[in-house]
Swiss-Prot record:
The lineage of its organism: Bacteria, Pseudomonadati, Pseudomonadota, Gammaproteobacteria, Aeromonadales. InterPro entries: Ribosomal_uL3, Ribosomal_uL3_bac/org-type, Ribosomal_uL3_CS, Transl_B-barrel_sf. One of its GO terms (cellular component) is cytosolic large ribosomal subunit. It comes from Aeromonas hydrophila subsp. hydrophila (strain ATCC 7966 / DSM 30187 / BCRC 13018 / CCUG 14551 / JCM 1027 / KCTC 2358 / NCIMB 9240 / NCTC 8049). NCBIfam families: L3_bact. Belongs to the universal ribosomal protein uL3 family. This is Large ribosomal subunit protein uL3. Part of the 50S ribosomal subunit. Forms a cluster with proteins L14 and L19. It holds the Pfam family Ribosomal_L3.
Length: 210
C-alpha cells in the first residue's frame, strides 16, 4: 500500500508498558485527510490521489486554490499532498482518510523537513574529525583539509563534502514502530524520533522494507 497520512508533529513524550518499561514516542496528530482530486492514467498519465488536511484562513487562500477546493467540495487545507495508487485502489473526491487506515500496520516510514541548522562546517555537517589542538597546529583545527589533487584532474570532484547549508531538507526515517493508534483523538504514537520541528508536517506511510 502506497497510501499514507499527512499529520502534524506535536512533540515527544513517553508511555509505559504493563511491565513498567518506558517507551519514548513521538505524537503525530492526524486530522482527516480530505481527497481533493483523483488522478488517472487516462487524464494525468498515472494513478494517484491528492489530499489536504487541516485548515487555512480564507484570506490566505489564493483564487486558483479556492476554485480547486470548491470544485472538490472540501474545506481549504494547509497544503496539498499526493499519494500514488496501486492498480485496483479506488477513491472518490471528498472522501476522508483517518488514522484507522494504519490500524493494522506495525512499522512505518515517516517523511518530514529536517530542522534547519544554517551554515555549518564540515565537522558538524559531515562528521569530519578535527585536527590536533596543539603539537604545532595553528589555525587548522577544524578545517576540512585537501579538497583534491593538482594538475590531474585539475578540478574538484562533484559531491565533495564541504561546509554549507545544513538541514531544512526532506528526510525519511524508515522502519519506525507504530506503538499506538488513537482513533478517538486522531493520534499516532511512533517509537523514537521523527524528522522535523514541532508543528511541522509529516507523512506517515507503511514501511516499504517491513
Amino acid at each position: 500500500m502506497t497510501i499514507g497520512l499527512v499529520g502534524r508533529k506535536v512533540g515527544m513524550t513517553r508511555i509505559f508498558t504493563e511491565d513498567g518499561v518506558s517507551i519514548p514516542v513521538t505524537v503525530i496528530e492526524v486530522e482527516a485527510n480530505r481527497v481533493t482530486q483523483v488522478k488517472s492514467v487516462e487524464t494525468d498519465g498515472y494513478n494517484a490521489i491528492q489530499v489536504t488536511t487541516g485548515a487555512k484562513k480564507a484570506s490566505r487562500v489564493t483564487k486558483p486554490e479556492a476554485g480547486h477546493f470548491a470544485k472538490a467540495g472540501v474545506e481549504a487545507g494547509r497544503g496539498l499532498w499526493e499519494f500514488r495508487l496501486n492498480n485496483g485502489e479506488t477513491f472518490t473526491v471528498g472522501s476522508e482518510l483517518k488514522v484507522d487506515l494504519l490500524a493494522d500496520v506495525k512499522l512505518v516510514d515517516v517523511t518530514g523537513t529536517s530542522k534547519g541548522k544554517g551554515f555549518a562546517g564540515t565537522v558538524k555537517r559531515w562528521n569530519f574529525r578535527t585536527q590536533d589542538m596543539t603539537h604545532g597546529n595553528s589555525l587548522s583545527h577544524r578545517v576540512p583539509g585537501s579538497i583534491g589533487q593538482n594538475q590531474t584532474p585539475g578540478r574538484v570532484f562533484k559531491g565533495k563534502k564541504m561546509a554549507g547549508h545544513m538541514g531544512a531538507e526532506r528526510v525519511t526515517t524508515q522502519n519506525l514502530e507504530l506503538v499506538r493508534v488513537d482513533a478517538e483523538r486522531n493520534l499516532l504514537l511512533i517509537k523514537g524520533a521523527v524528522p522535523g520541528a514541532t508543528n511541522g508536517n509529516v507523512i506517515v506511510k507503511p514501511a516499504v522494507k517491513a
